Amino acid sequence: MADDSELYPRFFKVFLVESASESLMIPLPFMAFLADPLPKTVKLQGLGGKLWTVSLKKISGAAYLTRGWPKFAEEHELKNGEFMTFVYDGHRTFEVSVFDRWGSKEVRAEIQAIPLSDSDSDSVVEDEKDSTDVVEDDDDEDEDEDEDDDGSFDEDEEISQSLYPIDEETATDAAVFEGNLDVEALTNPHFPTTLKNRIYELLIPANVVKDNNLEFGSSIKYIDGEGTLVGLRGKWADKRVCFKGWDRICRRNRLKKHQDTVECELLHDDQKMVHSIRVHVLRRDA
């Protein structure tokens, strides 16, 4: 979000212990950027990568961050006089930056990467396959997928929590991203994909990257009808561009094999640095 921050509305707040420990009021002029009626919850994403679910309530005509806010404040160790900027992506997620009293940006409440051995990584993947009701077993397609994905993880790769979990909610905005999409009308680079056996990573086609001179950082933001999720970049020996956490998008959008298509729209800044992937789900009746 920060790479394209001028496109997003924002506000700043000074943290005062006596008034902001239990709840935080959103400035009244900023309410024009929020949905009416207000969503019941929003997501706060810190610079450390984690996501917090926080209740949003209207009290005496003003919007307040309530349940969940004290935990955010505690885990960020907010001190009296420090201030924060809140950048809103329009999809119920705020990116929050914390500055100390001298104006230096602080990175706090960082998510920790967990290094796993190759055997541990395999067992995690198998456990996740057992727990999902989206992907159907298909040995033939597994073999085809392995041929397409012949790269292997580096031996010293750290497998981290690639997507920061989000609480399940009713997808009130899902219709915006589903239905008949005019692909030709998209002005940003884009590509189609379908539900595959290897759902844990989203591979960006090499020709799309090359033809559009795109650059990618260490993480990407997925945007769908429920909000945003952050996926970390995978490490491959052949330098292919892929991002983890795609399985969460597949599951929460209930994608079906041989039936649904996803058009992935790559949002980038003026320097061709891709910061977000907007997910358009195209349903096809069985």
Swiss-Prot record:
Question: Residue ranges of the DNA-binding region?
Answer: 9-102
Q: Where in the cell is it found?
A: Nucleus
InterPro entries on file? B3_DNA-bd, DNA-bd_pseudobarrel_sf, Plant_B3_domain
GO aspect biological process, one term: regulation of photoperiodism, flowering
Q: Name one Pfam family in it.
A: B3
Tell me the segments the record calls region Disordered.
117-161
Q: Which GO terms describe its molecular function?
A: sequence-specific DNA binding
- Tell me which GO cellular component terms the UniProt record holds: nucleus
Q: Does the keyword Protein biosynthesis apply?
A: no
What's in the keyword line of the UniProt record?
DNA-binding, Nucleus, Transcription, Transcription regulation
Highest taxon, organism lineage: Eukaryota
Q: Locations of Acidic residues compositional bias? A: 119-159
Record protein name field? B3 domain-containing protein REM20
Query: What lineage does the source organism belong to?
Result: Eukaryota, Viridiplantae, Streptophyta, Embryophyta, Tracheophyta
Gene name linked to the record: REM20
